[in-house]
Amino acid sequence: MVNFASEVDKNNAFDSAHPSRKCKGSLDCNDPDPIFRHKVLVIIHKLAISSWNRIPLTLCNKLHIKRISGALTNAVYYVAPPEGYHAPKLLLRIYGPHVELFINRQVELENLKRLARHNIGPYLIGEFSNGRFEQYMESTTLTCKTIRDPKLSIYVGRRLCELHNFILLHPHEVLEMPAAWKNCLVWLPKAKAKILGRKHSLAITSEFMKTLEEDFNAYYNWFVEWSRDKKDWFGLKMVFSHNDTQYGNLLKIKAKKRSIPLSQKHRTLVPVDFEYAGPNLCAFDLANYFAEWMADYHHPTHNYLMDRSRYPDFNARKLVYHAYVEQSAVINDLLEIEDASLLKTDISDELKNTFEKQIMNLEESVRAISPAANIGWALWGILQCLEEDDEWEDLSVSSQVADRPEKQLVEGSTVPPIGTSSFDYIGYSSEKFDLFYEGCAALGLNGRNRSTFSYA
């Protein structure tokens, strides 16, 4: 398998055998700029990252550091050496607050190494107390607009299929509860406790959370019964799943036009941020990806809203499904493709019928699992809301959120540090809870007077 990262920048590539190092030390993205830069270079020196030891600490103010947009859980930065120094560009990831509620870092780091063996995602370079350095890939992050490109939809379908098939589950993972249910069952009682412990009332109340728990249990029981005779369905396989397939976690790497065969062009699309990755049902990544079409996390005033009109129609979803099942046939040596950006048309009737059955199977599975994806992120939003926000009356009111004081930005940043009030987590959770109920209504379950979600 080709390592496409190395095709981008030969001098910037690390291979899967590159030993990652560990050191003590932590970074605070709210530190004044000179202090932040100095600490970054000190930790790089401690980790003995290739060629960086030649850069003296006195030049820390000459580092190129830029905040990268897209990540909601962590603060992520691009770090490059001063002019005149040749050292690999780095991706710096500073873990966000309260992430221990969601993420087992040891499992995540093991998964990164596991993925690197298949050239999926960046390589881990070094770890420190509250973050890590990764291989930097020259790339463009997908946006709420670019994900609507049909060619990229084909790439997404192919890449998700490869992720689900190349990374084999460990024996103990096969026996685990799918993350779609496991996360909700763990996060729901914690979210209830958080709402109950608030000093000030929110739009999301304790009474709402009690009703939600009952409705989630009813939905879960429905899914168990519905899927009982569908264990062999394509969309219900247990796979190694990304579990956070939002557009900010998909990179389009920059590669020389002739460096990658046409049949493998889809591998210029690189999934990143595997913090939530683990065993899950195949359809979850697809359902979550489609749900993220409704989001615009960089909207200047309403970054928490979900625009239902932006949800992909069936033809757009079918394009992703078709690419997924076609790539599965490629992996199983049932088909060869010449150009990964196109779908094959000259296939046997038998394979065509198989694809049609698998596509409808995926569509039904996506509709069934979509409420789980939405309620999971709704609970995540509540738990992400910082304790310090108790000082504010109601986080669900956008105008109040916009008026709060901002913390200091690091030079060159384009988005605020993790922990600032720029993202309305409670407003986001309210939107996702509504989508949960709308999805339940579409399945014939109690939607609590919400409209039925239209899959068009």
Curated annotation (Swiss-Prot):
Classification of source organism: Eukaryota, Fungi, Dikarya, Ascomycota, Taphrinomycotina
Transport keyword on record: no
Entry's family note: Belongs to the choline/ethanolamine kinase family.
Gene3D superfamilies per UniProt: 3.90.1200.10, Phosphorylase Kinase, domain 1
GO cellular component: cytoplasm; cytosol; nucleus
Keywords: ATP-binding, Cytoplasm, Kinase, Lipid biosynthesis, Lipid metabolism, Nucleotide-binding, Nucleus, Phospholipid biosynthesis, Phospholipid metabolism, Transferase
E.C. code: 2.7.1.32
ATP-binding as UniProt keyword: yes
Protein name, entry field: Choline kinase
Cofactor entry: Mg(2+)
Location in or out of the cell: Cytoplasm; Nucleus
Organism: Schizosaccharomyces pombe (strain 972 / ATCC 24843)
Molecular function via GO: ATP binding; choline kinase activity; ethanolamine kinase activity
